[in-house]
Amino acid sequence: MIRRLQYLYHMQLNFELPVREHHFKLRCFPSTDARQKVFNERIEIYPVHFSSTEKDSFGNTCVYGTAKQTHDHFSVDVQGEADIDIDRQLKDEEYKVGIFKYETPLTKAGTSIRKFHLELEPAVLYPNNFERAFYIMNMIYDDFSYVQGVTGISTDAEEAFNLRRGVCQDYAHILLALCRLERIPCRYVAGMIPGEGATHAWTEIYDNGVWRMLDPTHNRECDDTYIKISSGRDAKDCSINQGVFYGGGKQTQEIKVKVSVI
């Protein structure tokens, strides 16, 4: 059964002082793959002088552009629809996924995570990567609490694990850190789920030639209500907005997301 979802994404940067010659890279656009088909997508960027669309090294859709004129805010609005079919799995060749076996600065396992890993049941008890990752996810969920405001975008897995508190990015980074200790290929996913709020983060586990999705924040396998925006080794690879400009002073960012079932 295919589920159709409608999505709205809004991001706005507000600058304390005017900026100019703003060169940006945006990564906030769902792409069509085996599992999801995106259509009726509309994109509005303000201000913009020039833009082009390309794929990054992980296959994520990116828009590169320039806003030359002076401005005190910068915004992007994306809306569209997506058909999700969880029976169609995202396949990948094994030789392509090796990069996702290894830690990154944000998913590096320190003393606490390694100690936690030693206390887990032996991996031999689980028949495949997915079942093993599912067990690890359960153990994280029992030992971690969802709390906003105690971590930030630069918080790594070890720091969040020591706090035993954090948000979806932290849950995902901790699961990736533990799976990579066992050389299970796994990656970070940024996307959207039903309701109103911000973007969400979860993981993909490589198992027998396909990527299967786990949401450690909600302790479950992802269903047909998840819209994928991007994936990579960690949250840094899925950064929504990157840019350089002249001027600006302090800046604040607003993100609003709405996903509904049609």
Where in this protein do the model-derived segments appear?
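Intrinsically disordered, low-complexity N-terminal segments that are enriched in acidic
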Residues: 1-84
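Domain-scale recognition of soluble eukaryotic interaction modules
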Residues: 89-91
